[in-house]
Structures are given as C-alpha cells and as structure tokens.
Amino acid sequence: MATLLAWVGVSCCELAEEDFLAVSPLDPRYREVHYVLLDPSCSGSGMPSRQLEDPGAGTPSPVRLHALAGFQQRALCHALTFPSLQRLVYSMCSLCQEENEDMVPDALQQNPGAFRLAPALPARPHRGLSTFPGAEHCLRASPKTTLSGGFFVAVIERVEMPT
C-alpha cells in the first residue's frame, strides 16, 4: 500500500498495520482522523488478471460472497464511527452488487442524517446500479462498459461535523 500511495503522490497519510475492526475510533492515534480510504478484502471479481490465472475466480460462491459482504459491511459501519471523520472513500475491485451498491444504503441507515453520498468523479459516465436513491453518485466500471478492470467507488461525507 505504501508503494502505491507513493506512486500516485500521496504524502500526507499514515499506514497502520492492524485489525481495523479492533481499532478504537477514540484511540488518541485515530480520534482526529478526517479521511478514510476503505478498500477491504473482496471477491476480486473485477480483476481480469485473476480470471486469466484461474477461470473460476470470476464468480465467488454464494457462501464466500455472503461472508465477504458481512465483513465489508462491518468495516464500513466501523469506519463511520470515527468521531472526526469528514469523508470516506469506499472502493472495491468487484463486479458484485452485494459488495458494491448493497453496502452503501445499509451503512447510511446505521447513521441516519449524519452522512450522505457525494459524487464520485462526476465527469465519468458510468455510475452505480440504480438499486437505491443516490446510486448515481457512485462510480462503477467493468470490462464490458469501460474496457477496464471492474471496480466500484462510493464517496461518503459527513453532513455536519460533531460539536
């Protein structure tokens, strides 16, 4: 991750190699966190290179997909509990709606009125699947529509900072 961040010019971040779900948002190291890039483990169904290596890798089993989606939901909801959080980017290299669009409304409902979706790269034409109000703010790519790897991005921002 450090190599990727340096490659794209990110210099104002701190990486922590910990179990994210075990991190306390009130820990002095994290209570002033304003921005989170959440890229949890996923099926990788949007990664064409995985499918070339293993043709069966493109479609996860329902059991694996359910387990991954559960973990992703816990991670997303946990990230939204950081008291100073202003903006979160949720990204997936998956084509599965269960890992992408289905995560967003559930997380927003856990924090009613505290967060909203912000447009993710609004100039890009390919948006999230219309599965919930606001999905048009999400970004979705796939080998079929964008001739790229598959991915999903949702930008969630705090409506009002806590006092």
From Swiss-Prot:
Keyword Transmembrane helix found: no
Keyword entries, A-Z: Methyltransferase, RNA-binding, S-adenosyl-L-methionine, Transferase, Williams-Beuren syndrome
Residues forming the catalytic site: 93
Record-level Gene Ontology MF annotations: RNA binding; RNA methyltransferase activity; S-adenosylmethionine-dependent methyltransferase activity
UniProt entry tagged with the keyword RNA-binding: yes
EC number: 2.1.1.-
InterPro entries on file: MeTrfase_RsmB-F_NOP2_cat, MeTrfase_RsmB-F_NOP2_dom, RCMT, SAM-dependent_MTases_sf
Tissue: Ubiquitous.
Pfam families named among the record's database cross-references: Methyltr_RsmB-F
Example GO biological process: RNA processing
Taxonomy, superkingdom: Eukaryota
PROSITE patterns: SAM_MT_RSMB_NOP
EC class (word): transferase
PANTHER family: 28S RRNA (CYTOSINE-C(5))-METHYLTRANSFERASE, NOP2 YEAST -RELATED NOL1/NOP2/FMU SUN DOMAIN-CONTAINING
Family classification: Belongs to the class I-like SAM-binding methyltransferase superfamily. RsmB/NOP family.
Pathology linked to this chain's protein: NSUN5P1 is located in the Williams-Beuren syndrome (WBS) critical region. WBS results from a hemizygous deletion of several genes on chromosome 7q11.23, thought to arise as a consequence of unequal crossing over between highly homologous low-copy repeat sequences flanking the deleted region.
Protein name per its UniProtKB record: Putative NOL1/NOP2/Sun domain family member 5B
Gene source species: Homo sapiens
Underlying gene: NSUN5P1
